[in-house]
């Protein structure tokens, strides 16, 4: 009987010891949480990131708690302070919860392609971050032509996770010679992108030499893209284009994804155009994916070996 009572007392002490620790953890998370319900609060958050307040702050929680209309705002990406040599000085590394809300009428056009913004998107670059439940709706009409890693959600994502996001952003270049990327995430490095969708149409009508176009990622390095979809159309001169990703390198994977958007390569130069991926590098993998869109070759005049097209990969 004494042993049983002692066991019960020890169990009770253990429970009592755990309760305040759990409460403290919840209180600590709440204390570092930022709620955004207005455009002004979003811009204040962006300024705080630019000031370095979120550098390596992986416990920070930012919650978008309302739909926001950015009509009239000339967008500069969150975390857009770069040194003269192009090194990013400050960045976001916490958790950004979109909670299913939409940021609409986001116009990337005015500041895209300027020298001071080599990475561009809603976020410029994120490191060790989690971004989820966010819908971006807007446009980008190219007016500047410096090289840019452009992603509607993030220009560059390193050691990060992007999930349950939707991009409905049109990208249009009619006469500028551009280099870089266009996708939901421009350049994914050691990252995971899952349960995301691109609805935006991409159109590049000018010849390019080094440009990666993908519905979900432009360039994926040692990253995994899974359970994602593209329904946007792609009309392009770009050399590396895919419904899901422009190019896969270094152990990257695309799993359980599909694309139904129309793809239309242009010109007569070298093109790697695939329904899922433009270029598939050594050691990479595409599994359980399909392309069910139209491939329009009416404006494409390249001949073999410059003409590399495929329903899955270019």
Per-region residue spans from a language model:
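C-terminal segment of classical bacterial N-terminal signal peptides
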Residues: 16-24
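A generic membrane alpha-helix/interface feature
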Residues: 6, 20-21, 56
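Surface-exposed repetitive/solenoidal architectures
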Residues: 24-314
